[in-house]
Amino acid sequence: MTSVNVKLLYRYVLTNFFNLCLFPLTAFLAGKASRLTINDLHNFLSYLQHNLITVTLLFAFTVFGLVLYIVTRPNPVYLVDYSCYLPPPHLKVSVSKVMDIFYQIRKADTSSRNVACDDPSSLDFLRKIQERSGLGDETYSPEGLIHVPPRKTFAASREETEKVIIGALENLFENTKVNPREIGILVVNSSMFNPTPSLSAMVVNTFKLRSNIKSFNLGGMGCSAGVIAIDLAKDLLHVHKNTYALVVSTENITQGIYAGENRSMMVSNCLFRVGGAAILLSNKSGDRRRSKYKLVHTVRTHTGADDKSFRCVQQEDDESGKIGVCLSKDITNVAGTTLTKNIATLGPLILPLSEKFLFFATFVAKKLLKDKIKHYYVPDFKLAVDHFCIHAGGRAVIDELEKNLGLSPIDVEASRSTLHRFGNTSSSSIWYELAYIEAKGRMKKGNKAWQIALGSGFKCNSAVWVALRNVKASANSPWQHCIDRYPVKIDSDLSKSKTHVQNGRS
């Protein structure tokens, strides 16, 4: 108990060091001021009169500096609102339904009809991965894959993506009452499906956006592309004043489904599900009052210069010529290394002085003592961040980040619940997690939320937001009909998940 109190005292002293120093300084100046006489004031005024040019120049430079700072500083970027797509109920799939879809896909593939469908080991492998994935029985599959026989056509892929994007945007425009023609910047990201005309062009056409819109379409950038899109929109909002930026993050499941027998490529079939999010950003000062959040920091880390990082998630042909996404056995180590580099950049921006000092001290000690100190000090990010939105890439990803960042079960609750309810929706998963926190009523004014996105390349990207008010869930939130059933409890044997309401956590 004593060590805990000492640590708390240490953190308080360092975090409030400048404030603590300010009190004696203020007292000293107040004491000096109380001893001033009328004669001292006359002498001071006389000094100003004899040095009028110097005083005037100093005042002019001060005013010029303040004006220059106000004019050149970037405008704040506000998150007015966002919308996560909720697919229709008939697209819900249980674990057993997903297994049936896998079987139908393999059966429909003429090159594997006599082998893969009759291979119990392949389907048994898929079943084990599916049951241990952390996904529940109410995730969503695209229309084309539910159809018997499955439709893996280009038209089915386009239909899936258009329904997700249009559905999310219609709800966003309805909630914000923003006219689509007011949008000045558009960024759409979809890794696997990039038709011509582009998805951003489809949005322009569907919602009749204006002809001078700054439009961007990001492809092939993986599950971390959502934060990349936010970062790009932020930079554009710093240049183009008084406008709105629209960010759309989604992924296509129909296009990315794998029908072969390579087990490294089968895993993604078990994790990815339908989902997408639309986010409205603004740099208009008048939008602060109605916005939910202000963007504080974005940090992007790319370790693609290393071959192991570059190849750990890769779309390629298998031995029989079928295209799939191969997940390397090195992915966990690569993700950990990339995350470490990302938080090494983000930490100094958000951590209190006490944590910065401890990290710096252990860094110097490790350099001097080398082998005597095995690990660097892991900062307590819970002192700087109130809510964590970790990409719901899978149970292993969430477990690893929970351990590496020293988080508690409630810190990763939003991620686990999103994975269970919606599966891995790729770049949009961090928005379903933020919506979960809002639906639980936990987002209070001044709270900071940290979105952590991991993706192929290999990339780790972070976005930190601060709540401008007590944030409630928006209309038509994806959690509005099921939030009372969460969080979920996953059995320790990883084989089955059961949903129940924990006392005091609903």
Curated annotation (Swiss-Prot):
What does the UniProt record report as the effect of altering residue 389 to A/S in this chain? Answer: Normal activity
Q: State which tissues express it.
A: Expressed specifically in seeds, especially in embryos. Expressed in siliques.
Q: How does it sit in the membrane?
A: Multi-pass membrane protein
Q: Explain what the record says happens when changing residue 302 to A/K.
A: Loss of activity
Instruction: Tell me where the transmembrane regions lie.
Output: 13-33, 52-72
**Active site (UniProt):** 223, 302, 387, 391, 420, 424
Pfam families per record: ACP_syn_III_C, FAE1_CUT1_RppA
Description of what induces expression: Repressed by herbicides such as flufenacet and benfuresate.
Q: Per the entry, what modulates this protein's activity?
A: Inhibited by K3 herbicides such as allidochlor, cafenstrole and flufenacet. Strongly inhibited by metazachlor and only slightly by mefluidide.
Effect of mutating residue 460 to A/S: Normal activity
Q: What happens when you mutate residue 270 to S?
A: Reduced activity
Chief localization: membrane
Could you say which enzyme class this protein belongs to?
Answer: transferase
Phenotypic consequence of residue 424 to D: Reduced activity
Q: What is the effect of changing residue 223 to S?
A: Normal activity
Effect of knocking it out?
Strong fatty acid chain length ratio (CLR) reduction.
Family, as annotated: Belongs to the thiolase-like superfamily. Chalcone/stilbene synthases family.
Q: What else is known?
A: CLR.2, the major quantitative trait loci (QTL) involved in seed lipid metabolism is associated with the single point mutation L407V.
Described purpose of this protein according to its UniProt entry: Contributes to fatty acids elongation and stockage in developing seeds. Active on both saturated and mono-unsaturated acyl-CoAs of 16 and 18 carbons. Required for the elongation of C18 to C20 and of C20 to C22 fatty acids. Also mediates the synthesis of VLCFAs from 20 to 26 carbons in length (e.g. C20:1, C20, C22:1, C22, C24:1, C24, C26). Has no activity with polyunsaturated C18:2 and C18:3 or with acyl-CoAs having 22 carbons or longer chain length.
**Protein name from the UniProt record:** 3-ketoacyl-CoA synthase 18
Per the UniProt record, the source organism is Arabidopsis thaliana
